Structures are given as C-alpha cells and as structure tokens.
C-alpha cells in the first residue's frame, strides 16, 4: 500500500463522524497523526491506535497516538484483529483507495467488530465532473495528489461505495458529500445531464453525483 505525503492538517468532516465517546479507535493510514491529535482534544481517554505503512510517518504519529503499528494492514497477522475485538471505531481517511483489496479487508473487520462499532471513511469520488471532462478527451494522467493520485489503486463512486460496504456486511448509517463550488463546472454538468439522458439514466442524479470531490461516511454492522 503506497501512501501520499504526510502533512499536519486533519479532515474536519471526518472528525465529526467519529463517535465522541469511543473507548478504542484504530486509524488505518494515520500518517502524521493529525486526526488523532484533534480527536484527543475531544476524548483524551480513548485508546487511539494508528496503523501506518511508512515508518517515517509512524514516527510522527507516535506524538499523538497511544500506539502505532508499522505494517501493511492487508498483510498484518490475525492476532492484530483479535486484539481489536472491542474496537469502537475504525477510521479510513483517504485510505481505502490505496489498498489492493479493500473489499476483503472490510469483510475481515466485519468478523471482529462489535455490533455497536462503526467504520468512518473518507473516499474520493471518481465520478467527479472534472474526471469525466478529462476522460472525454483521453486525459487520464496520474498526478502527485488529488483524484488522479498515482498511489491510488482503486476508484469509487457513490453507488460503488454503498455496494462495497453492503457486500462486506455493513450499512451506511450517514454520509456527507465534500463539494467545492468550483468554477467552470456548469457547462460540464450540462453535458453530463445530456449524456445521462442518452443512456436512459436520471440526468439530475448524474449531475448530483458529479459534484462531490469526496464522500465521508459512517458504516455500521448490518
């Protein structure tokens, strides 16, 4: 699992979806520990465990996490999951798209997570209008960050996010779209509506699903 560069900023929208009274949290891809830093201001008694693939990032995260496991979450041993049996919340902040098989990992977590537990995740939206516009002219070039981040292995839309969690045994209890009022999108959205009509799809749904840059969701065991 490749990671994007560490930074000290946290995802405020993701933070608001984390249960405020969690006793144990596992954050996969904790990077510099910025989210742990902010959550500890809300709930300092929580046991906050970070999982980080990059040793240099893990060292930074140790400033704020109670413990940090340096490992690839997809190859970590079964004992780790046994130790998280009473984990209230798993966090994937822009992480699932970096995994080889996020479907398998979510299914594994479902076997161990308590019925009262939850997964909080932030996931990029590949249906974003800018992606569709670039694909229209064959411009699929990897970049160092953003929707075309070269470290992304998987891509999701609103629909396939629901499918991924449902197939793993979770229901999405709540969610929010991270939508920026970006210039130049209106003409593209008009074209997206026209394209949707041409294939018998709902034009307004197609345009609505093209707005979010990312989705933040909270999933619970089904």
Regions found by a protein language model. Give the residues of each.
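Conserved N-terminal segment of class I S-adenosyl-L-methionine
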Residues: 1-89, 103-106, 137, 159, ...
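Short catalytic micro-motifs in class I SAM-dependent methyltransferases
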Residues: 93-98
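A structural helix-start
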Residues: 99-100, 123
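Short N-terminal helix/helix-N-cap motif within the alpha/beta-hydrolase-1
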Residues: 100-104, 131
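A short glycine-rich, Lys/Arg-flanked "PGG" loop and its adjoining helix->strand segment in the class I
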Residues: 103-118
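Conserved class I S-adenosyl-L-methionine
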Residues: 121-142
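Acceptor-substrate binding/catalytic loop of class I
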Residues: 143-160
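A SAM-dependent methyltransferase catalytic signature shared across enzymes that methylate proteins
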Residues: 161-176
